[in-house]
């Protein structure tokens, strides 16, 4: 059984036992988290009906908080000596999917 969930503006295909890396979620490692925005569930049959999907929940556990790769930004203006360097690392959360409730 798998589900497609939406969190942090992105969609993820998850199954029980998977570890996914999503945009930072509030909570400490070990805390339970519910991913309620379920877009599709495929088990015995494929479910895409919004009324049935409203009953489905994907539960998980926060495994760790990490950072993404370093992104370097360099701004430059010609003939003025203007250089601006900046870096960014996106905070991420690793979530271990513990279950997909069918809502039946």
UniProtKB/Swiss-Prot annotation:
GO MF annotation: an example: structural constituent of ribosome
Keywords assigned by UniProt, alphabetized: Ribonucleoprotein, Ribosomal protein, RNA-binding, rRNA-binding
A cellular-component GO term for this protein: cytoplasm
A GO BP entry: translation
Database matches in Pfam families: Ribosomal_L21p (PF00829)
UniProt KW Ribosomal protein keyword: yes
UniProt signal peptide: none
Keyword Ribonucleoprotein belongs to the record: yes
InterPro entries in the cross-refs: bL21-like, bL21-like_sf, Ribosomal_bL21, Ribosomal_bL21_CS
Family: Belongs to the bacterial ribosomal protein bL21 family.
Assembly mode: Part of the 50S ribosomal subunit. Contacts protein L20.
Function: This protein binds to 23S rRNA in the presence of protein L20.
Protein name: Large ribosomal subunit protein bL21
